[in-house]
Amino acid sequence: MATMQSLLTKVLPILISLMIGRLLGKFKLLDAIGVTTIKTLVTRVTLPFVIFQAFYTVDYSLDTLLVALCVLTICLALFALGFTLKKFVRNLTLLLPFTLTGFEMGMLGFPLFLLLSGQERMGSIAVVDLGQEIFVFTIYLFMLRRETGSRQSLPEAVREVIKNPVIIAVLLGLLVGVTGLGRLMAGTLAGEVVDGVCGFVSAPTAALILFSIGYDLRLDRRLLSRAMKTVLLRLACVLLIGGGLTFLLFQLIPYDPFLLLAMLLMLVLPAPFVLPVYSQSPQEAEFVSMYLSLGTMFSILLYAVLIIIKPMIVG
């Protein structure tokens, strides 16, 4: 009964929000421009508040560094495996290495973990996200632009990263957390004000993200088989490499059930949603969008599995 209640209270809101997004598009209440505006609002305003609050509440230690290095290693290993497999698997996508690595933490990971574990445990997903952010905003995007012919000078790339509100939120959160200012504010009026502002501004983030994802969900029968093979290939690679390195990580650091939940959630997430933007052709962009839609559906399904096994992990 408790498991069914958890599924209903944590998965049903997600499914309904996705359905609302789909219906908004079907009945022309929302168009592509509107969805772009929603995504801009989320990524530049509400999501940075979620991320800042998560990062500044982390209790940073050597274990934090080990987790970040583990996640970075997972991303790099999957990336290298993608380039190796690309030589043998030529009928899926030219962007195969980029479909196998990277995780959509911002637009999907943070909102799902918030529903799964609550605001007080968001520090766990922040620790996991640190290594992933380093990978995506440096190696992943640099190589993706290079692969797709979107040239950009190093100074331009650095400026773009520094000006990104998500990165600013991460850096500010790290600054407040690492210096101990976050601990000093805990339980004080200043801490309550910061948490209150962050909580209020970030409140609509999950719903807005899910509306936009629901609008973008596309299942094209022509591309279904190829997209399904790519999704299953990613899941197999992530299970092998991500699962193995996660097991190794917890041999090196004390067991933390919510950190394990955060790691597992990251591993079931789809590739970064930015991928279609850099596709070389409309056909490739169409396939990548289909792949991400299918990957998102698998992520929701596996998220439901996480909800079921959460009592066994947390105890």
Name each region found by the language model.
Residues 1-315:
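Alpha-helical transmembrane segments of multi-pass small-molecule/ion transporters
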